[in-house]
């Protein structure tokens, strides 16, 4: 339990370090971000610690997410195997969201298999993917702990390229295969 508390506080401190620098809306883009993730749980996991951790990270970044969908997948109706969560983010704090993404990316950079942020573009939306995040806990299991976080940003046609340039300065981005 002590490890879990230390992990939470270090993550909180890291994400809070310069959260206000994106409060000014320099791009003038009314973003409508939707964030979704699929988490594989630990072997034998029966609680929903990851939902709490995931939402805590969003609250720290001042997003106050609205949960759209939570879906669970069980093994033999008892052991939680994975869950899917989808949230709508606060439009007023859209640039806090970019700071959240940047800090989250930097924090977990050393445990990525692909050290980049992947993206796809569909009509008026830009979809970003962070793949293969590994979380460090006591019973860390490398094979069971891969996850993907997907962020969808709905934009007007002309704004997708501006946003892409902006994000490209923050992350190493490549097209998802």
UniProtKB/Swiss-Prot annotation:
Keywords: Mitochondrion, Ribonucleoprotein, Ribosomal protein. Signal peptide: none annotated. It is found in: Mitochondrion. Its main location: mitochondrion. One of its GO terms (cellular component) is mitochondrion. It comes from the Eukaryota. Belongs to the universal ribosomal protein uL5 family. This is Large ribosomal subunit protein uL5m. The lineage of its organism: Eukaryota, Amoebozoa, Discosea, Longamoebia, Centramoebida.
